[in-house]
């Protein structure tokens, strides 16, 4: 497969919103119209359907993992693998199928990290779990994991290109949480289980 086609395919895969599709399949409201307005697993969970949230999480993570893993499996150049990783993540943030209005990228970023290194993904996930357990703020948990991920990548990944990608994904994820950052600072952010 042509490298450019691989990158484009990764973007299109990233543009598929499992939060929207799963919610529709379960007869739930469009997650963009309720709660935080984010079509991610945490907001789908606010509907009360744990299975729907789990499927959203797995779908969004899998679409981040699959194209990167395939690019590595077919021994594409590291530079191409990096572009594939960025493309699938941008597809989730700015999906062509939903007028370029997507999610915040937490699960998809985790999928990319998993393809790079299971240990890296595990450390990022552990960071999220610890902060969420202590604070009940999924946004703060995501921001903490994003802030720590480049450091983990620096220690674990041998390819500088992959480290740069993790840094870029972390910056984009933090940027997508800018409204949450403002709410955290002024005390108006709703913890999980409370209305946004």
From Swiss-Prot:
Top-rank taxon: Bacteria
Family as reported in the entry's similarity comment: Belongs to the PlsY family.
EC number: 2.3.1.275
Top-level enzyme category: transferase
Catalytic activity: an acyl phosphate + sn-glycerol 3-phosphate = a 1-acyl-sn-glycero-3-phosphate + phosphate
InterPro entries, sorted: G3P_acylTferase_PlsY
Subunit annotation: Probably interacts with PlsX.
Record field: transmembrane: 3-23, 78-98, 112-132, 154-174
Metabolic or biological pathway: Lipid metabolism; phospholipid metabolism
Role noted for this protein: Catalyzes the transfer of an acyl group from acyl-phosphate (acyl-PO(4)) to glycerol-3-phosphate (G3P) to form lysophosphatidic acid (LPA). This enzyme utilizes acyl-phosphate as fatty acyl donor, but not acyl-CoA or acyl-ACP.
Pfam short name (any one): G3P_acyltransf
Keywords from the named record: Cell inner membrane, Cell membrane, Lipid biosynthesis, Lipid metabolism, Membrane, Phospholipid biosynthesis, Phospholipid metabolism, Transferase, Transmembrane, Transmembrane helix
GO molecular function, one term: acyl-phosphate glycerol-3-phosphate acyltransferase activity
Membrane topology summary: Multi-pass membrane protein
One cellular component (GO) term of this entry: plasma membrane
Species this protein is from: Methylobacillus flagellatus (strain ATCC 51484 / DSM 6875 / VKM B-1610 / KT)
GO biological process: phospholipid biosynthetic process
Keyword Lipid metabolism listed: yes
Cellular compartments annotated: Cell inner membrane
Protein name: Glycerol-3-phosphate acyltransferase
């Amino acid at each position: 497969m042509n490298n450019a086609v691989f990158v484009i395919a990764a973007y299109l895969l990233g543009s598929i919103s499992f939060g929207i599709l799963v919610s529709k399949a379960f007869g739930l409201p469009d997650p963009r119209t309720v709660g935080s307005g984010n079509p991610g697993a945490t907001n789908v969970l606010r509907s009360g359907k744990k299975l729907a949230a789990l499927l959203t999480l797995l779908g969004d993570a899998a679409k981040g993992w699959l194209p990167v893993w395939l690019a590595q499996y077919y021994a594409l150049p590291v530079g191409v693998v990096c572009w594939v990783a960025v493309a699938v993540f941008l597809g989730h943030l700015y999906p062509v199928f939903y007028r370029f209005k997507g999610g915040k990228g937490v699960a998809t970023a985790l999928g990319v990290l998993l393809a790079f290194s299971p240990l890296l993904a595990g450390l990022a996930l552990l960071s999220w779990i610890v902060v969420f357990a202590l604070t009940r703020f999924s946004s703060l948990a995501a921001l903490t994991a994003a802030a720590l991920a480049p450091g983990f990548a620096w220690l674990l990944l041998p390819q500088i290109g992959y480290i740069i990608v993790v840094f870029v994904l972390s910056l984009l994820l933090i940027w997508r949480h800018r409204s949450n950052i403002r709410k955290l600072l002024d005390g108006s952010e709703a913890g999980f289980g409370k209305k946004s």
